[in-house]
Design a protein with these regions (language model features):
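Short, charged interaction patches at domain edges and termini
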Residues: 1-14, 46-60, 96-131
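Small/polar-rich, solvent-exposed N-terminal microdomains that initiate assembly or binding
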Residues: 1-53, 75, 82-86, 91, ...
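Charge-rich, low-complexity amphipathic helices
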Residues: 37, 65, 87, 106-110
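Residue-level signature of transmembrane alpha-helix interfaces in integral membrane proteins
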Residues: 60, 80-82
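Active-site-adjacent structural patch at catalytic or cofactor/ligand-binding sites
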Residues: 60-69
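Histidine (H) residue identity feature
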Residues: 66, 89-90, 119
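A generic structural motif
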Residues: 68-74, 130
Length: 131
């Protein structure tokens, strides 16, 4: 299993431990609108860059995690952001063939989406090394 799949699986497994619906791709209708039942968390893009040198074979990555709420206030989305933080920030996630060196939240924002729902985004930065 490649590093990209390993990281995706580890993040997904950590997030499903919290009592929320978690998707790696939320279901959509033909027009691209979400058909997922709110509230939910969605794993967005995970961008990788090599971090190799003579001593270390690894990757750095940035993972974007989305929270979606239709509760009528930002509070639910912010609470979801807190649950995501608790599940991932400085977590020791098991990864087959990799060692997680670092995982930390860098940014978190909640804003109103065009459909009047609330959309939160957390960005996490991590580093992994091959074992």
């Amino acid at each position: 299993m490649g590093a990209e799949v390993t990281v995706q699986k580890a993040i997904y497994d950590a997030l499903i431990a919290i009592p929320l619906r978690v998707y790696d791709a939320a279901p959509q209708d033909a027009d691209g609108g979400s058909t997922a039942m709110f509230p939910y968390v969605e794993i967005g893009f995970i961008a990788f860059s090599e971090m190799d040198d003579k001593a270390v074979n690894g990757f750095e990555f940035v993972a974007r995690i989305h929270s979606r709420s239709r509760s009528g206030s930002m509070m639910e989305a912010k609470e979801m952001q807190g649950q995501i933080y608790a599940a991932l920030h400085h977590a020791e996630l098991p990864m087959a063939g990799q060692r997680l060196v670092l995982l930390r939240r860098e940014t978190s924002i909640v804003e109103r989406a065009p459909d009047r729902s609330f959309h939160g985004v957390c960005e996490f930065r991590g580093q992994i090394e091959a074992t």
